[in-house]
From Swiss-Prot:
Keyword Acyltransferase: no
InterPro entries reported in the protein's UniProt record: A-crystallin/Hsp20_dom, HSP20-like_chaperone, Small_HSP
Protein name: Small heat shock protein C1
UniProt keyword terms in alphabetical order: Stress response
Organism of provenance: Rickettsia typhi (strain ATCC VR-144 / Wilmington)
SUPFAM superfamilies assigned to the protein according to its UniProt record, in alphabetical order: HSP20-like chaperones (SSF49764)
Gene: hspC1
Entry similarity comment: Belongs to the small heat shock protein (HSP20) family.
Signal peptide residue numbers: none
A Pfam family per the record: HSP20
């Protein structure tokens, strides 16, 4: 039973993603086919996780774009309604954390109105990102994060002695 927990967990986490897919054939999909497609998409995501150095992990539907240029990487995110005090960008090791949260509670006409809007991204950075000069700006609902690139010298291969 324990060996199935990761697959079950992955299916639960992404069920909303599969349902919202624009290219999914809902008419001809059977429940078994839907589960098989979901598992297949997770295997692909796991493959990307281990084979790509840069990977977005997202928990919301904020539109984002990653641009590679000669001297920098640029992350552009559409975050309408957020101001700079509601967005946090943090660097921890080789991971860049981007989070936004809006909570508003209004009492009008004897009724409680509550709104909560949030997003969370974790980005694994390439080796050539200059972590000391990362910058971010928010203008007209567009968050732009600049990741300057530096030249990375390849280390000489080191032979490991087998005992």
């Amino acid at each position: 039973m324990l060996k199935y927990i990761p697959a079950i967990f992955a299916i639960i986490l992404s069920s909303n993603i599969a349902i919202a897919s624009k290219n999914y054939d809902y008419i001809n999909a059977t429940p078994l086919r839907q589960v098989a497609d979901l598992i297949d998409s997770h295997i692909t995501n796991i493959d990307h996780l281990f084979n790509n150095r840069l990977m977005f992990y997202e928990s919301s539907s904020i539109k984002s774009k990653f641009i590679t240029k000669d001297k920098q990487y640029v992350i552009i995110m559409e975050v309408p309604g957020f101001d700079k005090n509601q967005i946090k960008v943090k660097l921890n090791g080789k991971k860049l954390f981007i989070a936004g949260n809006i909570e508003e509670k209004n009492k009008a006409n004897d009724s409680d109105n509550y709104m909560n809007k949030n997003f969370n991204y974790v980005i694994s950075l390439y080796e050539d990102v200059d972590q000391t000069n990362i910058s971010a700006r928010l203008k007209n609902g567009i968050l732009t994060i600049i990741l300057p690139r530096i030249e990375v010298k390849e280390q000489d291969a080191k032979e490991i002695t087998i005992n």
